[in-house]
């Protein structure tokens, strides 16, 4: 893969401005639209924002970690950044498409790289019905919320909520309840990536619910349909000795 033209994007208000200045001195960067690869300096959040902003260009992303966890990022190695990009391996991600209908009948669509989540808006637990591929699988779940995570997002909010970590090539989605009250011992489900998942919110007046696709939030939702998109894909580049698959395995052993 030809990766001679590199664009650099970052948060100009970043606390890691000294590291960014060092990275800027390494190379003569080009505009994003002309790039072979987009280098994102920051954390996972910065990478996600830029994926959403530029995914339509079909250009690979290479993340450089200036944040804390940086699960989707590569370690900061200023001296070898350019070489690491040239020798990197690519992982392909398919985002989720969320279609949410609010109580006024408006339809909201958004893409999610990590997860789509629904959660209670007040102090009362949410109640919802779950369908998979048009078949009712749970007539009532009482919980703070629920989420559907991609393999790339399974080690983020999903893991903190008690969900499973999914290998990147598993072609599966993880449906995880958030603080499930009834059924109390239900820990979620692993579903094929081809599944269409629908949450129908029960008692929306008394128990209002919001929905998010990554960082995009929509209020007072009455139903949410989630499915993986095959017509859109994102390529993330990882150092050859620090692949995303390696990180997913390591995370399952407390690494």
Swiss-Prot record:
Its cofactor is a divalent metal cation. Keywords: ATP-binding, Cytoplasm, Kinase, NAD, NADP, Nucleotide-binding, Transferase. GO terms for cellular component: cytoplasm. The active site is at 44 (proton acceptor). It holds the Pfam family NAD_kinase_C. Its EC number is 2.7.1.23. The keyword Nucleotide-binding applies. NAD(+) binds at residues 44-45, 49, 114-115, 144, 152, 155-160, 216. It comes from the Bacteria. It is found in: Cytoplasm. GO terms for biological process: NAD metabolic process; NADP biosynthetic process. GO terms for molecular function: ATP binding; metal ion binding; NAD binding; NAD+ kinase activity. It catalyses: NAD(+) + ATP = ADP + NADP(+) + H(+). PANTHER family: NAD KINASE. Belongs to the NAD kinase family. Involved in the regulation of the intracellular balance of NAD and NADP, and is a key enzyme in the biosynthesis of NADP. Catalyzes specifically the phosphorylation on 2'-hydroxyl of the adenosine moiety of NAD to yield NADP. This is NAD kinase. The gene is nadK.
